[in-house]
Amino acid sequence: MILKRYRALLILGIVFAILIVLMVFFQKIKRDELNNQLKKVELKNVRIGVGTSNGTLGTAIFGEINNKGENIISIAEMNVEFLNEYGEVKKVHKFFPVNKFSFRESLPLKPRQSKEFGFPIDDIVPEDWDGTFTANLTELIFK
């Protein structure tokens, strides 16, 4: 009697549980795929220096991104963590060394292609930044 009464609700709950399991499964597959692709893209010679970036003289983060994969990259996201003297992360900022929406350089990064980048950071760095940082690629979007 109870089974007949709540049959539709039970079926709906089972379908909902299956959808959640499938969603988690596909997210893991997508995350693993992204991690494999991130291994094929290299940040090289990332450094802080004084120079001209976007036509402005000042302190900037410079480097090179190298696509060792088979796919054309239209957007690459890089997280830079600015550390204090105790090694604590004081600020995280996103930069886009490859960005198809950029007015300045909207070209994609083709396989076996490298590109130099530079971004001004004078207005970004925290006051207690000691000059150390880490930079990692966190996201890739392919053409």
Positions of predicted regions on the chain:
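Membrane engagement elements in two modes
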Residues: 1-60, 115, 133, 143
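Generic "edge-of-domain/loop-turn" microfeature
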Residues: 48, 53, 70, 83-87, ...
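Asparagine-centered strand-capping/turn motif at beta-strand->loop junctions
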Residues: 65-69
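Terminal connector regions
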Residues: 111-143
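Hydrophobic residues positioned within well-ordered beta-strands of beta-sheet architectures
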Residues: 59-63, 76-78, 117, 133-138
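Exposed aromatic-hydrophobic patches
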Residues: 62, 104-105, 116-121
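Solvent-exposed loop and beta-edge segments used for protein-protein assembly and interaction
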Residues: 55-57, 72, 111, 129
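The feature marks short-to-medium sequence segments in extracytoplasmic or secretory-pathway proteins
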Residues: 71-111
